[in-house]
């Protein structure tokens, strides 16, 4: 039996998040059903991160123990893909060491969040971007973003329920990139994140971009350690787990 790692993407629109739950469709549930079809036994999987309902992934990573030692990487990839629904796709398969667990061995996780500020709604991208048809001051957003880089207590930028967990996190890089035609990318890099943290960061930066807040307000929210001071959460469908680095 060999430990296998897979990198895969999924459209999170029609899933109730990544983590397996009873009576609802989840990414982990569909993946483990496909593995059971291929290998004829139940196989537990270990993921680099658990995305919320509606959140997508370009580079999620999962490990599991493969009961068939004769299959090569490409055989495993093709067999799993043949049994997955159309909104999940295995991109890469590789053999790794026997205890590899992407959740604990990830050195960095990169999230992308897309905002469409164009005046007309694009029906063909609406599942993957936050349509926000208002002008944003990108330079002010970049100033505000600098307050969040480094190690901080991010409880103000988390969902309820994180109070009893360690809320110190480190953001290694936070970039705001103007792509084209009103499309904006917010790229956030860190080792790990609190639940809702990236979406909260985006919502607070957008509040600055609209001119309602000055950039320094984000620093105040951070230092307050009070979730009620935050601008809330940006919509889930604009967020992608882009890449996990080891």
From Swiss-Prot:
Q: Name one GO molecular function term.
A: tRNA pseudouridine(38-40) synthase activity
Q: Which reaction does it catalyse?
A: uridine(38/39/40) in tRNA = pseudouridine(38/39/40) in tRNA
- Enzyme Commission numbers on file: 5.4.99.12
Annotated binding of substrate, by residue: 111
Q: Name one GO biological process term.
A: tRNA pseudouridine synthesis
Catalytic positions?
52
Alphabetized SUPFAM superfamilies for the sequence? Pseudouridine synthase
Task: Identify the domain of life.
Answer: Bacteria
Which CDD domains does this chain map to? PseudoU_synth_EcTruA
This protein's UniProt keywords:
Isomerase, tRNA processing
Please state the span of the N-terminal signal peptide per the UniProt entry: none
Report the Pfam families cross-referenced here.
PseudoU_synth_1
Query: Family per UniProt?
Result: Belongs to the tRNA pseudouridine synthase TruA family.
The subunit field of the Swiss-Prot or TrEMBL record says:
Homodimer.
- Biological role stated in the UniProt entry: Formation of pseudouridine at positions 38, 39 and 40 in the anticodon stem and loop of transfer RNAs.
Q: What is this protein called?
A: tRNA pseudouridine synthase A
Q: Which organism is it from?
A: Fervidobacterium nodosum (strain ATCC 35602 / DSM 5306 / Rt17-B1)
